[in-house]
A protein has these predicted regions:
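N-terminal functional modules and adjacent low-complexity/disordered segments of proteins
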Residues: 1-2, 14-16, 108, 123
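N-terminal small/polar-rich segments of proteins
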Residues: 3-103, 135-170
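Surface-exposed molecular-recognition determinants
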Residues: 100, 105-108, 112
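Amphipathic, heptad-repeat alpha-helical segments used for oligomerization and assembly
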Residues: 109-151
Length: 170
């Protein structure tokens, strides 16, 4: 899935990731499940999901929140978590030009989103500066869905949404 959200100011998301964990077993203990491996999904795990941001303001921050995973007839508890690990952050110069350069600028803290729609700070104001385009790479093998014990109904498909919030301004 490719979504592009840009605002009149030009600020917004150039690309947001989709996380698919495939079919999971119901377990009697808390479990962490990795992303599914498939040829048509991030190159069978050889490519990383990423979030790419465009912003024009020098002051900006990023938060994310995870909704409660739901199926047609069931919900996973709000104690369910999406673990993204620490994400390397890169900036771009000459973006979308033949001379484009991607530069490593740092790493986020380990990212953990609870499935309760609570905003979690990913990047603080002025944590990264000097560019208008940034990318967070989520290491494929570090992305996990943590499900509490005895949760889920066999045969159900659960979906949740990550809301990425780019805050810009003076």
């Amino acid at each position: 899935e490719f979504r592009r959200v840009l605002f009149r100011s030009g600020d917004g998301f150039i690309s947001t990731p989709t996380f698919d964990f495939g079919k999971l077993a119901i377990s009697g203990s808390k479990q962490q499940y990795g992303l599914k491996k498939a040829a048509d999904y991030y190159g069978n795990g050889t490519r990383n999901p990423y979030l790419r941001i465009k912003k024009t303001q020098p002051n900006w921050s990023l938060t994310a929140q995870l909704s409660q995973p739901k199926s047609a007839t069931d919900s996973l508890p709000t104690a369910t978590r999406l673990l993204l690990g620490a994400a390397p952050v890169s900036s771009f110069s000459n973006y979308n030009q033949p001379t484009e350069l991607k530069n490593a600028v740092g790493t986020t803290s380990a990212i953990s989103l609870n499935a309760n729609n609570t905003a979690t700070r990913i990047i603080a104001n002025q944590q990264f500066t000097g560019s208008n385009i940034y990318q967070l790479d989520f290491t494929f093998n570090n992305v996990k869905l943590e499900v509490p014990a005895n949760q889920g109904v066999k045969g159900q498909q659960y979906q949740a949404a990550i809301t990425w919030n780019l805050v810009t301004g003076p």
